[in-house]
Amino acid sequence: MALLAGVARAAPAPLSGERGRTDVASRYGSGAFGRWFVDGFGLPAYRYRIDEGRDPRARRSELEDAADPTDAWSQLGNDHVVANAYNHGYTQLWSQDRVYEWVNRYSAAEGQYAGGFGYLRAGGRTLSTLYADRPPGARSKRVFGAGYARRTLAAAGFAVDEHVYAPFGDDPVLLHDVTIRNRTRKPRSASWFEYWGVNPWEPAKARPRGLGTPSWDPRRHILSVRQAAEGPDRRPLRIFAAALRGPVGGHATDAARFFGAGGRAAPAAVAADRLDGRRAAAVAPGQVGRTLFALRAPLRLAPGAAVTLRYAYGAARPRAVRRIVTRWRAARRPLAGSQRRWARWVPQGSFGAGRHWLARELQWAAYTVRSGATYEECAHSHVISQGGYYQYGGFGSQIAFRDPLQHMLPMVYAAPALAGDVLAYSAREQPAGGGQIAYGAQSLCRPAELPPSNDMDLWLLWSAAEYGLATRDLALFDRPVPFRGGGTASLWRHLKLAYVHQESLRGPHGGYRTTSTGDWSDFSGAVLGMTESTLVSAQLAYVYPRLAALARARGDRAFAGRLSRRGAALRAAQRSEWTGRWYTRGYAGDRRLGTGVIFGEPQPWNILAGVPGRGQARTLVSGIRRFLTGVGAPAALGGPARIGSSMSPAAADPAVTERAGGPGIGGGNAVFVGGAWYAVNGWLTWALGELAGVVPRAGAYALDELERNTLAAHAAAFPGRWNGVLSVDDACNAWFAPDPGDCGIDLDHTYAGQIMHQPAWTLYAATRLAGIVPTARGYRFRPRLPLRRFSLRLPRVGIAVRPGSVRGYVRPSAGGRLEIEVARPRGSRVTAWVGGRRVASSVRAGLVRVRLDTRAGHASDFAVTVR
């Protein structure tokens, strides 16, 4: 018995049982606009500190066509809606349930001010909580948190503390908590006026939607208005606001009567301390109306006393509005509950005392990706759109098809139900019987009217493989999924048809034929004259074996064999594309592209597919570092890169002997597209990690690339740029560009940032560098980080490394026996553990193998220790 007790005491503590939060306290990467800190919920938050009305740094060159170029915002959201909380104090709500629309677009010129703020009337004074309209001498604070936006105002003996948030979960609603405190020694009477604008706007059409006449439900304290049925949306959502907590002493819906001569800063109705309840007139489509939702709360506060009011705002089906209001009226402390769920969900990473900022970055990245999810009624699914100017700006479309599929990759390990929804959403964009998938989607599941690309199928295939292998949810692939245009087939059938279509694009030189749009790099076909892409063949050389592993797990041996053979053939074909320094980009007719210049796109995929031998890998990494990262480049070019590596060398580099399609993103590029792309650098980070132990210092190079592609790195390098502090565009300028701190693709100067590539690829690349890889039989844990100690815990998988031990856990969506492979720690005697008990193991090729019996949704722990 004593011996057994000793064994039990020696068992490593289960990693899944650790509940402590890792340290994310660091100011590194704050930029010039404010400071990062850890809030009372234990989550990263950013305090915006500059006065945008006075400080010239607030003016953003990338918003030169915006109504207010000092706009700075942070993303709010849950699994259903997205919202932007602005430095000025208002919040805009975005909905994709039906048409893609801003529900309450800010337009000062037309008297629409978005919402999520209010006015306190007391002692004959009006106190606005908008930052621009704050009273003289008032003390204020603005915080952008992971899950909320907070504003505080102290003036005239009162303190107002506001939180706007989309409660964690799947309801299409924003909540606004307002706590008002009497800071004086005598009783005070006051009135709070809650304000929400109603100004639905479709970016794709660049026009407002029509509205009916607002209605008031006196029993439930709900204001609502129907949107006009027009175009393809014959069943539009109803916009609503409701008082959930606190007294109600009047309501208003007519903005002209509410603001009157006092305007935004001091509305006439607030000055009168009265709301008249008259209904705003209906609004014709294409016209901006004067509809608003205002609610008055009369208050009496004892000395030092405080009251918390709560309001809801959203857009939903008419029958759902009452349900949503009832649910959140009954909720106790919904803000704290929502934040607790975010705090439990975000990844917990530890990478050493000097990298608390990196742990913060991963939490913020995970929050950004998940809060960027929306629900689309036409697909009965959630999707994680690309965001940014593509979704919310002038394009107003869900483009491109491949984007949600890459954004779901890290969610496979953090929110698998959401990832599965994205997979099903994407599969239904496939035309009946297979064929070319459209470039993207418009609202109501309509195809985007843009030329297609030749890589759409492969992204569907890869994301499906990642999901199936990681979650073991093989039943999803039997689920019936509609085709675009009619008909239904199992998800597995969709994947087989995608494979057939992808292979129908084979070109004469072993690559895949392009259209004018090209492949990943949009318009590469037209700009480069490229008729055949070897980027796609390199990608498929990696993807097909992964899908083959899923096919084997499903028992589809015939398809698995077909995929494996094709993957081997592609690897062989890619080896012939070696130029002696790197791999080619493609063909223009019979002419090879990329013999005298390195294109960044295909290199990582050749590495991931296992194409280069050891010597070629060393040569390739040397070329990447020299030409794309700028290490050892001529000093006059401006390198090395302070943020991500470039996709192109510098046109002025004397060692470049081929140029095509420049000047590209930001200028100065030798080849199209150029610039530093967060997705492509995610591939590069991951690929460099795979060469750890093959190429000297490859693991260190991978960590270096990961860190340079963080928001913190951009804010540290270019502290005066807001674009890159809380979010960023899909691309930034290269290190040799005239303005290396600028970001964006120069197609829209009214919207910037909030694109999902950077957070999604930061989080996914981190899981790969941590060594987490699902396999046909289970999982492989082979750390690539050059750190003696680190840990990374996500909801569905985790790993912790220290000298002499590796601990981990998996929490699959479906149970069964898994084979776990763990890199053998250095030491003389290996012991394997499962669930705290010693188990039999084997060692092969440096990997310790154990069997793990799992239950759906439950954590199964393992460990490998040495003496």
List the predicted regions and their residue ranges.
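An extended acidic
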Residues: 17-38, 77, 83-154, 230-277, ...
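Short, well-ordered beta-strand segments enriched in hydrophobic/aromatic residues
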Residues: 80, 174-182, 304, 805-812
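An acidic-aromatic substrate-binding cleft motif
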Residues: 27, 31-36, 40-49, 329-398
